[in-house]
């Protein structure tokens, strides 16, 4: 029995050792694995799902590509004795993101992942690739391994939508940059055909991650292309991972495992664990020791005012006061004489086209997605590689000592928080490598109040602060009481000698003497010199002396003295005598020129559009696509905005109105229009248009047009209305028998045919029927475009608004002219090379306008005004295109048939030629007038020669008018042509006989032809 028990114990011991060794081997193998985290991002939007028939075929190819890729995810052995292991997951997206499967280890999760991919049902709506990439990044970071350089995204998409589409998650550039910032490599795989390489290049990490990867193809070599794409991507990942996993020196292959070793010694003490959860509140402690000496107390309150002090000593004399403030400025002077009126400026040129308008408002946000299901709890991660410690930062500069602050009040301790729940102890992982700095997060909510901290140690005393600024000067104290009389002082120093006293009065006479007169005594010795007398007081200033004679002039001083102070304004002088009358000014603008100026400067005189009722019929079928549907709505709003701003159309009750009908298959029409219960202005209508949802059904255009006629056009009362139909021109006429010409009887129609999401061209026959081009009356306009983005082109919008406002109401700028006498008017047209054929055609149109105006003017008799047209070029190159004629139809036809000579310029020969014509053809009693088209440049002709010829023309009774075009004008020759004088140019005469325009297009601009014809008729 004992032997049996010993044998059983030995078996148990060997079994435990064998199990322990297997566990150790498994741990060794797991530690040597080199994991790769791979996530598929699959596009199942409408641009992929509905591109080819049968619908969903490209999605099926994408699923097949993904499953074939998953089958290739097998372990790879590296020479550094490590194995490449795969973790794979997938999502698919359209305008929302659906997680197919989170990261799953291969090969154990291969079958489940493939089944999930095969079960995909495409969404078939908008394409939000930016949101899908960011969701894939999140799944890689949350569910992947701890390594940073082993994460890959496989983005399978066609690159749609087009540029300019507003993506809700920051845009494709932002998503691609975020992946690069986090070290995630992104492969972009195309869904062909019609993919957008530009967008795919943005998605890829660099060109090596894009190349020519494709997941679908309509070519016979599809399987080979897909297989090559999968193999190339896997080889790139394998090479990248081998470099990162085998960065150390390679070792030879490991041998078979040896026998178990002896039990090791007791291990070293482990690292301190993480701080545990906050424990329960402890028992109250014993009373603490006496605390340290308290801080200095707070500053006391201000004391009461002291008693009044005694009178102080008399203060010393104060310092001299500061300079006073400058005095107030003097009164404003009298107004000067009014200036003379300035000369009238010439009308300016037309301004350049303004910059494009501001970008429109962003569209409305889509509905918020539903809350996702909670994910499964992840397995604990493997122990990471310890990160290298960061470099020690450089010591900062010592800051300046702050001012000594006053001690604050001691705060009251906060309440103890409730005991927290004790959490389970997690495994302590080594610190990872420092990650890149993430984007700045939003401001978080304030955290709960922390526990009351213990009293810190007394800080070191601060450095002594700098002396404060001197305080303000104190107020003068009150006078103290009178003091007691002081003791008698010591005698003072002797004072200064006083002034001499007054002369005393004469004394009384003494008694008479009784002695004899003695002899004169000898002269005494001269006495000593007396002390100097005291200086007398200063005398008063004496009277001013007479003015002395002027001295000789001094030497010149080359240095100028300082400028004196500006003197005060002098008194107004007397009014001067009126000056002599000035010369006669040039004549003011006539009536036609005033109208021209008003038309250019006054916006109220511009042509106005409206009232006009506008009807939009919007195709919302499946073949349009969600993105194109959004663009079509933007187009409607932009047309309304342009009509409001550029054409000043007022969309309000009683004025212009707008309505929009969107449609798909039968009975799916939706109407929004001004006059609805919840739409009372144009802003509400535009918001209602933005809120229209894509129907994505069939296409019954005829039924929609009939619905618009019965439900919308009956609301419109204006005779001026336009319908704009936006469709791909592919109506299902088998199911919809309603004719496409339903609107032809009631309104002009513009049919806009745009290629669908499959790039199929619109049906031109249906578009022509919608636009009523086969009808005898009310024919509209049919326009075709390749894609919907062209609808938002500036020039295209301009063409649409111009058609809507083709019947503008313009002010009447008629400027009637009257001939008081018969007149024979000749138009002498320059046909030389310097004019150019295009400008010559412009001149012909201008000549026809002049001829029509001359012949339709008020005149004494029907045949009293005749017009002739002659063109000229070089010498002996003159041609009468129209002899004197009063029939405008004949003149217009002849002018249209005029051929450009394209030769030299000789205006002298032309003037001599027309003198002969007038002598042969002019009537007696009729005024002779000629309008010469010339810039004054004539080959080989001097101003003196022109002067002689013009004087001969004037002597023949012919009045000359000149029309100069352009800026390269020979001014002296032009003045001679007008006046016949090379000197003493008469400005007033020139104003009536000389016309100038900056270029040939200005001939047909405004009412210039009326100005020219009026001046010729009046003179």
Swiss-Prot record:
Reported modifications of this chain: Prolines at the third position of the tripeptide repeating unit (G-X-Y) are hydroxylated in some or all of the chains.
Cellular component per GO? basement membrane; collagen trimer; extracellular space
SUPFAM superfamilies per the record? vWA-like
A GO molecular function term, named singly, is: extracellular matrix structural constituent conferring tensile strength
Q: Where is the composition biased (Basic and acidic residues)?
A: 299-332, 370-380
Lineage, top-rank taxon, reads Eukaryota
Task: Provide the VWFA domain boundaries.
Answer: 37-233, 613-800, 824-1012
Sugar-bearing residues?
Answer: 212, 514, 535, 799, 887
> Any idea what this protein is called?
Collagen alpha-1(VI) chain
The species this protein belongs to is Gallus gallus
Gene that encodes it:
COL6A1
């Amino acid at each position: 029995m004992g032997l049996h028990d010993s044998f059983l114990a030995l078996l148990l011991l060997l079994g435990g050792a064998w199990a322990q060794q297997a566990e150790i081997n498994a741990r060794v193998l797991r530690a040597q694995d080199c994991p790769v985290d791979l996530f598929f991002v699959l596009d199942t939007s409408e641009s992929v799902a509905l591109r080819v028939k049968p619908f969903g075929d490209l999605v099926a190819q994408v699923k097949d590509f993904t499953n074939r890729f998953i089958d290739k995810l097998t372990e790879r052995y590296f020479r550094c004795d490590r194995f490449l292991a795969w973790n794979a997951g997938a999502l698919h997206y359209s305008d929302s993101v659906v997680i197919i499967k989170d990261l799953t280890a291969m090969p154990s999760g291969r079958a489940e992942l493939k089944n999930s991919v095969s079960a995909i049902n495409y969404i078939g709506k908008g394409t939000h690739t930016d949101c899908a990439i960011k969701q894939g990044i999140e799944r890689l970071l949350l569910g992947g391994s701890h390594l940073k350089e082993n994460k890959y995204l496989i983005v399978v998409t066609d690159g749609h939508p087009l540029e300019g589409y507003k993506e809700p998650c920051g845009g494709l550039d932002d998503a691609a940059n975020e992946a690069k910032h986090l070290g995630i490599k992104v492969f972009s795989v195309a869904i062909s055909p019609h993919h957008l390489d530009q967008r795919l290049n943005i998605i890829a990490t660099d060109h090596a991650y894009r190349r020519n990867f494709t997941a679908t193809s309509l070519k016979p070599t599809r399987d080979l292309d897909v297989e090559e794409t999968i193999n190339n991507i896997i080889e790139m990942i394998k090479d990248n991972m081998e470099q990162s996993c085998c960065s150390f020196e390679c070792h030879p292959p490991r041998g078979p495992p040896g026998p178990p070793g002896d039990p090791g010694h007791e291990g070293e003490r482990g690292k301190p664990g993480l701080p545990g959860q906050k424990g329960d509140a402890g028992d109250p402690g014993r009373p603490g020791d006496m605390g340290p000496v308290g801080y200095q107390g707070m500053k006391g309150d201000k004391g009461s005012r002291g008693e009044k002090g005694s009178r102080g000593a008399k203060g010393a004399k104060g310092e001299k006061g500061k300079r006073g403030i400058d005095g107030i400025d003097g009164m404003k002077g009298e107004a000067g004489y009014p200036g003379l009126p300035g000369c009238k400026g010439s009308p300016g040129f037309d301004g350049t086209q303004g910059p494009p308008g501001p970008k429109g408002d962003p569209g409305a946000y889509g509905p918020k997605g539903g809350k996702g299901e909670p994910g499964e709890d992840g397995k604990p991660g493997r122990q990471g590689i310890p990160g290298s410690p960061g470099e020690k930062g450089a010591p900062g500069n010592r800051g300046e000592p702050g001012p000594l602050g006053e001690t604050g009040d001691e705060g009251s301790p906060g309440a103890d928080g409730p005991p927290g729940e004790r959490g389970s102890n997690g495994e302590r992982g080594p610190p990872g490598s420092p990650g890149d700095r993430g984007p700045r997060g939003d401001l978080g909510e304030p955290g709960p109040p922390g526990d009351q901290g213990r009293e810190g140690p007394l800080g070191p005393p601060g450095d002594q602060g700098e002396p404060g600024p001197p305080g303000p000067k104190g107020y003068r104290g009150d006078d103290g009481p009178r003091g007691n009389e002081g003791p008698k002082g010591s005698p003072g120093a002797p004072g200064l000698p006083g002034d001499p006293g007054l002369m005393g009065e004469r004394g009384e006479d003494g008694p008479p003497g009784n002695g004899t007169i003695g002899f004169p005594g000898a002269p005494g010795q001269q006495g000593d010199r007396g002390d100097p007398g005291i200086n007398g007081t200063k005398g008063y200033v004496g009277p001013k002396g007479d003015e002395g004679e002027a001295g000789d002039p001094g030497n010149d001083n080359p240095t100028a003295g300082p400028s004196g102070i500006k003197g005060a304004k002098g008194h107004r002088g007397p009014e001067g005598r009126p000056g002599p009358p000035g010369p006669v000014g040039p004549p003011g603008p006539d009536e036609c020129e005033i109208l021209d100026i008003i038309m250019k400067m006054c916006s109220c005189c511009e042509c106005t559009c409206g009232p006009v009722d506008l009807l939009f019929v919007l195709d919302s079928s499946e073949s349009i696509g969600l993105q194109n549907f959004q663009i079509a709505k933007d187009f409607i709003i932009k047309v309304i905005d342009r009509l409001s701003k550029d054409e000043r159309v007022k969309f309000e009750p009683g004025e212009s109105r707008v309505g929009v009908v969107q449609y798909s298959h039968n009975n799916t029409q939706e109407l929004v229009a001004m006059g609805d219960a919840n739409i009372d202005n144009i802003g509400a209508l535009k918001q209602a248009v933005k809120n229209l949802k894509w129907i994505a059904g069939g296409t019954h255009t005829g039924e929609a047009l009939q619905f618009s006629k019965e439900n919308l056009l009956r609301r419109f009362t204006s005779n001026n209305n336009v319908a704009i139909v936006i469709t791909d021109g592919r109506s299902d006429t088998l199911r919809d028998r309603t004719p496409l010409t339903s609107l032809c009887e009631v309104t002009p129609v513009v049919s806009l045919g745009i290629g669908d999401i499959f790039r199929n061209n619109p049906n031109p026959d249906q578009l022509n029927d919608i636009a009523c081009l086969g009808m005898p009356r009310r024919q509209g306009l049919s326009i075709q475009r390749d894609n919907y983005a062209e609808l938002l082109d500036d020039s295209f919008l301009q063409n649409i608004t111009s058609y809507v406002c083709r019947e503008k109401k313009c002010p009447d700028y008629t400027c009637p002219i009257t001939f008081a006498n018969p007149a024979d008017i000749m138009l002498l047209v320059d046909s030389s090379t310097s004019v150019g054929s295009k400008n010559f055609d412009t001149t012909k149109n201008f000549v026809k306008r002049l001829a029509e105006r001359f012949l339709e003017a008020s005149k004494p008799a029907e045949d009293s005004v005749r017009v002739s047209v002659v063109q000229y070029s070089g010498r002996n190159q003159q041609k009468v295109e129209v002899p004197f004629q009063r029939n405008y139809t004949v003149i217009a036809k002849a002018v249209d048939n005029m051929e450009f000579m394209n030769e030299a310029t000789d205006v002298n020969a032309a003037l001599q030629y027309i003198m002969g014509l007038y002598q042969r053809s002019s009537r007696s009693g009729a005024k002779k007038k000629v309008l010469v088209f010339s810039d004054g440049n004539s080959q080989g002709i001097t101003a003196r020669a022109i002067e002689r010829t013009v004087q001969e023309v004037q002597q023949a009774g012919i009045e000359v008018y000149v029309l100069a075009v352009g800026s390269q004008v020979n001014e002296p020759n032009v003045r001679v042509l007008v006046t016949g004088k090379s000197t003493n140019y008469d400005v007033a005469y020139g104003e009536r006989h000389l016309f100038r325009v900056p270029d040939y297009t200005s001939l047909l601009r405004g009412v210039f032809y009326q100005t020219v014809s009026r001046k010729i008729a009046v003179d």
